[in-house]
Amino acid sequence: WRVGARDPSKGAFMKDSHGRVIDYMRISLTDRCNYRCIYCMPADGVTSLCHSDILSLEEIERVVRVAASMGIKRFRLTGGEPLVRKGAVDLVRAIHETPGVDDVSLTTNGVLLPKYAEELAAAGLSRVNISLDTLDPEQFRYITRRGELHEAIDGIEAALATGFDPVKVNAVTVRSLGQDFLAFAKMTIDRPLHMRFIEYMPVGESAGSHGC
């Protein structure tokens, strides 16, 4: 990327190597997660980063201010599972209140949305993406290793009830699992959901595992 200026009075902005203006940034709040999905993390022995090894919330806010001054208008918070990070709601509020920021969104597994959805909306969160790879309860437990399907469904319902728009569901497609994609399509018939299927990428420790 490179830095330019469309107008001295409007500050700097960033472009990629193809000349496209960059106005979007993803920020990972934590490497911690309350699931251990088979394509993402080992079942046991996961060593999380120490708090001293990740950016503090104040440092993230500083990054956002600098990025916004360079033309970044849209921010997405991810993880790990971002809602396990203490202070996530306050961070959403700080980003939303930063001059130049138009949109704050979140990618989550949905487990903590029933608890935090209303607070997040009040803080300025606009929309959410919820990761959900199957609608079969047994398969859900197999994929996440420690979750229950109703937790994710409750998260989706909480997001819809709170008024996030849009609410997107992300499903990673894994060949060996034989997921029922028609069930996902049916779920969107009576719910205003955006459904996205994401191709599994066999990288790192998950490459070749579970017959993927």
Stretch-by-stretch model annotation:
Residues S17-L57, S69-M70:
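Canonical Radical SAM [4Fe-4S] cluster-binding loop centered on the CxxxCxxC motif
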Residues G45-C50, P114, D136-I143, G204-S209:
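A short acidic, helix-capping loop that chelates divalent metal ions and anchors anionic groups
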Residues I54-R76, V84-I189, H194:
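Radical SAM/AdoMet-radical enzyme domain recognition
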Residues E81:
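Conserved G/P- and acidic residue-centered "switch" motifs that form tight phosphate/ATP-binding loops
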Residues R175-G178, R196-C212:
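Flexible glycine/acidic-rich beta-alpha junction loops that bind and position SAM and/or redox cofactors
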